[in-house]
Amino acid sequence: MSVPLASRNAGEPTFSLEFFPPKDEVGEEQLWQALKEFQKIEPDFVSVTYGAGGASRDRTTRITSEITTRTGLPTIAHLTCVGSTRDEICEVLQQYKRAGIKNVLALRGDPQAGPRAPWVETPNGINHADELVSLARTEGFTVGVAAFPDGHPASGGNFSSDFDVLLEKERRGATFATTQFFFSAEKYFSFVAELRKRGSQLPIYPGVIPITNVKRLHRMAELGGTPIPQELHAIFDGVDDPKKIRELGIEIAVKLCNQLLQGGVPGLHFFTMNSALSTSEIVTRIGLR
């Protein structure tokens, strides 16, 4: 089952979800409970992240395959080249094939020392996501890639370089992109407009994160190179009650999603943190389901 580029509800934007492979049985139970809730509002597709270690790769394969089998939802397995040889990456793709997975999100991945650390080449490895796109396309996968409206953490604010990289991925066969989460609709639309000027037709699905934990948000923003606007700092300043934080986070996400939908985005991609509560409420409030 390949990833749809149009909503199951004709004429509407898609909505899609990202999960991570649980580390234990408790986490896995939470994931399946979240998916059970999400099935009620019919996401168009889901993706599952991928770590550099072999155990995490195996979990990604198993969880992604089981989601397809148990829910019937189109699924995307993440794929990175961190710390892997070309042969090892080819074997991962073969594992995906055997598991019935037809879609991958091709990412270079963060250096093992952190997203801003120098890239360390793996002997006989792959060092750029565009090479990964070519390899996955050769193996018959539908391939998505990442986009960064706030700039890639490793590019040092060189947006021209970011655009060149994304265009090369498209040239090599990528058919869609999902973005890192961000908080400015204006930045997203400026990013897409510049990409279109350069000839790209790639659908760019904006990534949205429901804020439920401020410390986790800061950690993820630092890892992904996403600036947190001063007004968000002000909103959460002095707020310690988890329920209030969740309510504020939902309001922020609803406002951003409405701005994006009014601007004509092809869909919305939610970073769920393996929980249905906030994302389901946001999707319902913005009228996607």
Task: Identify the residue ranges that each predicted region occupies.
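Active-site glycine-rich loop that binds ribose-phosphate moieties when present
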Residues: 128, 157-174
